[in-house]
Amino acid sequence: MSSDPGYQAPVVTVSSSIPRRGVGDSVLIVPVVTRDDAAAVLAAAPFLDKDAVREIEAALKSLGATGGEGQTHRLVVSALPVASVLTIGLGKERDEWPADTVRRVAGNAARSLDKVAAVLTTLSALDLEAAIEGLILGSYRFTEFRSAKTAPKDGGLRAITALSQESKSRARDAAQRATDIATAVATARDFVNTPPSHLYPDEFAKRAKALGEAAGLEVEILDDKALVKAGYGGIVGVGKGSSRPPRLVRLSHKGAVRTRTRGARPGGSKRVALVGKGITFDTGGISIKPAANMHHMTSDMGGAAAVIATVVLAAKQKLPIDVIATVPMAENMPSATAQRPGDVLTQYGGTTVEVLNTDAEGRLILADAIVRACEDNPDYLIETSTLTGAQTVALGSRTPGVMGSDAFRDRVATLSQQVGENAWAMPLPEELKDDLKSTVADLANVSGSRFAGMLVAGTYLREFVADGVEWAHIDVAAPAYNSGGPWGYTPKGGTGVPTRTMFAVLEEIAREG
């Protein structure tokens, strides 16, 4: 269903029954639950007859299966026309199943079938969209840089048949929406997983442009000369140390219906600004990082990746709001031309900043982008970045921190939890602004304290948000990149977080304002 120039999702179809022909090489994924300390088939009717259910449950009993969440068993079932059945445990039986539980176990199932080309599933009877999303996200692979020696010989999951009793029109729309969302997440993952040798500011900008134009977006790119001329001191300053100059990319989805009078938006239409940090590699600059795990800094453009994927998704889903993404891109390198600790730069808009630590570079490029984004007079501003290591210390590897205007911050965090990305609202105490005082400039880019690092960074960014704009920043320093083992629908490497959160916010704004 994807027409993107990048990631191609499996083909998804929805059926009201198991086809009797053409599925001889397919695997049927069947959810089971824990019932009376044994595994019992769930969501069988009307897709599985009693003989098939009895055969599956008898086989599971002989294996001692309990139906615990994530527990899988591969079975050959003579009563069904498929090659085999994969049972996937949901855990203790309940009346309703949260969407992310369905999404997560679908991801587990897909990962356990990594050499299977075609699957069918009755998980979709529990939640059609969540099952499709989970299967696509769980089957994600990044193999672009594998040679013939190590590349997978199979093509991975290419076809999904979701079994559902939904009406044809509802099923078609749900399948397309789920495919589009999962494709957006996979696109963000691809960006994050692409090494900095191949994804530097100019190349990143070109790929963003290709995606944007394919989705019908308006695209603008400012090169290094244009950035200097326009006064983007933060982006220029961070990029000074690299031989690969910085860029600023603007992607615009004009979904709000215009009136005839001067192109004004009607009262019910909203404009949302998105800003994402695009540091294609971060050494820390002159304030250089430790060598251990520096290779993970290929993910320091995770915020930009998610923002680009989200605005493309908004266009594909034809959201009736304006969404304008402003994406600064730079490489933070040490060299004879790099900015130094103690330098003073002028952010776009005129604020002067004493750079006490060149490894606090993300906030410098974001501040420029925030000011530019606010010139579009948005109703809402959502930023995201791999902002601070302090996010990881405070919230761990899977929980983004959300800072911003109190009501909008809470709205973003709530929606993030609903879609399974599980962000947590964080405060911005007013007294932290005193920690950013400078004796030579308007602001310092870091405080002199090692405490509250995430909140101090958020306080810095707040200084650049225009009055009256509802604002939220999502810090995904650890959640954007999974350095551990895969789990659920989340692979090792780029995760695509917080693409689904931002899209959920955009959808709610489109519905409710």
From Swiss-Prot:
Active site: K289, R363
Annotated binding of Mn(2+) 1, by residue: D282, D359, E361
Alphabetical keyword list: Aminopeptidase, Cytoplasm, Hydrolase, Manganese, Metal-binding, Protease
Cofactor(s) this protein requires: Mn(2+)
Keyword DNA repair: no
Residue sites binding Mn(2+) 2 per the record: K277, D282, D300, E361
UniProt-listed Enzyme Commission number(s): 3.4.11.1, 3.4.11.10
Catalytic activity: Release of an N-terminal amino acid, Xaa-|-Yaa-, in which Xaa is preferably Leu, but may be other amino acids including Pro although not Arg or Lys, and Yaa may be Pro. Amino acid amides and methyl esters are also readily hydrolyzed, but rates on arylamides are exceedingly low; Release of an N-terminal amino acid, preferentially leucine, but not glutamic or aspartic acids
MF GO annotations: manganese ion binding; metalloaminopeptidase activity
SUPFAM superfamilies: Macro domain-like, Zn-dependent exopeptidases
First-level EC class: hydrolase
One of the protein's GO biological processes: proteolysis
InterPro entries: Leucine_aapep/pepB (IPR011356), Macro_dom-like (IPR043472), Peptidase_M17_C (IPR000819), Peptidase_M17_leu_NH2_pept (IPR023042), Peptidase_M17_N (IPR008283)
GO cellular component: cytoplasm
Location in the cell: Cytoplasm
Database matches in HAMAP family: Cytosol_peptidase_M17
PANTHER family in alphabetical order: CYTOSOL AMINOPEPTIDASE (PTHR11963:SF23), LEUCINE AMINOPEPTIDASE-RELATED (PTHR11963)
Function comment: Presumably involved in the processing and regular turnover of intracellular proteins. Catalyzes the removal of unsubstituted N-terminal amino acids from various peptides.
Family from the record: Belongs to the peptidase M17 family.
Protein name: Probable cytosol aminopeptidase
Protein source organism: Mycobacterium sp. (strain KMS)
